[in-house]
Amino acid sequence: MKPILLQGHERSITQIKYNREGDLLFTVAKDPIVNVWYSVNGERLGTYNGHTGAVWCVDADWDTRHVLTGSADNSCRLWDCETGKQLALVKTSSAVRTCGFDFGGNIIMFSTDKQMGYQCFVSFFDLRDPSQIENNEPYMKIPCSDSKITSAVWGPLGEFIIAGHENGELNQFSAKSGEQLSNIKEHTKQINDIQTSRDMTMFITASKDNTAKLFDCTSLKHLKTFRTERPVNSAALSPIFDHVVLGGGQEAMDVTTTSTRIGKFEARFFHLAFEEEFGRVKGHFGPINSVAFHPDGKSYSSGGEDGYVRIHYFDPQYFEFEFEA
C-alpha cells in the first residue's frame, strides 16, 4: 500500500474530511490555511484563505456547495466550495472547536471553547435567514457550563447533535428546543473525535482514555469498545466492511523524547464486531490526529502531527480478507 502524500500545511493537521461523494478531501491544520484536494490522485484543487489562526474543524454540506470552517481566530466561516469565496463570517468570543452542516445543509452548528472567562456555547444558525448571520444572532444558543465540548456531530435527520466533552461525557441536544435529550459517561477522559457510520445509525468516539467506543446514535447505548495502549485521537467506521480505523499516539509534549517505534504512530485496524485488531499501517512521524474512510470504503486517509496527510488505497488482499472468528 503506497500512500499518496499531501503536503499543504506547515503545522500539524487538526481535521480531515471527505465530501459525501468522496472526490474531494478537505484538510485543516494549526495554520490558517484550509486546503481541498482531489482524493483520487492527491492533486491540490485550491485553498480557502481568510482565517488568521489555527483552524480546528471543517465540514462540507450534502451537495458540496458550501464549506464550513471553525478557527482559533474566534470565527466560523462559510465558503463557496467551488470558487473559494467567503460567503459568511460569524464572530465568536472564543475559539470555535467543532462545526457541522445538518442533513439538508440549511442549518449550521458550531461550538466554542471555554476560555478567557467565556462559557462554552453551541450555536445554531439557519442559513435560509440571512439576518441571523448579519446580526450575529443564532436562532438557538445552548450553554455548557460544566465541561467544554471537544467534539460534536449532527445526529440522523438533523434532529439533534451528539456532543462529546472534556470530562468524557456524551450527550444529545435537540436542534429544535436546545434541551438535553440524554447524557451518558462511558469514557473517563476527554473525547477527541466523534464520527458517524455511513447510515447514521451508530457513531464511534475516540478518547484520551486509550479507547474508542461504538454507540447507537439515537439511544446512546454503548455497543463495543476498542482498546489500545495510547490516547486515541481519531476513529472512523468503514462504510462497506465491519472495520474500524483508529489513529493516535502519545501527547504532543511527550513526542520528542521517544523513538518512532515506541511512539506507536500507526493507524490500527479493528474488527467492528469482534473488537480484535487485525492490521496496522505505519507512516507518520508523530501522532495521527485525524483519520477518515473514503465513502466508497476503498481507501482511507490520515492526517498527522507532522503536517502531512496520507491517502492510502487498499490492496486487493484487503477486500478478500476473511476474519477468522
UniProtKB/Swiss-Prot annotation:
Ranges occupied by WD repeats: 8-47, 50-89, 144-183, 186-225, 283-324
Keyword line: Cytoplasm, Initiation factor, Protein biosynthesis, Repeat, WD repeat
UniProt GO BP: formation of cytoplasmic translation initiation complex; translational initiation
InterPro entries: eIF3i, WD40/YVTN_repeat-like_dom_sf, WD40_repeat_CS, WD40_repeat_dom_sf, WD40_rpt
Subcellular location: Cytoplasm
GO MF annotations in UniProt: RNA binding; translation initiation factor activity
Assembly and interaction partners: Component of the eukaryotic translation initiation factor 3 (eIF-3) complex, which is composed of 13 subunits: EIF3A, EIF3B, EIF3C, EIF3D, EIF3E, EIF3F, EIF3G, EIF3H, EIF3I, EIF3J, EIF3K, EIF3L and EIF3M.
Family: Belongs to the eIF-3 subunit I family.
Known function: Component of the eukaryotic translation initiation factor 3 (eIF-3) complex, which is involved in protein synthesis of a specialized repertoire of mRNAs and, together with other initiation factors, stimulates binding of mRNA and methionyl-tRNAi to the 40S ribosome. The eIF-3 complex specifically targets and initiates translation of a subset of mRNAs involved in cell proliferation.
Protein name as annotated: Eukaryotic translation initiation factor 3 subunit I
Gene: EIF3I
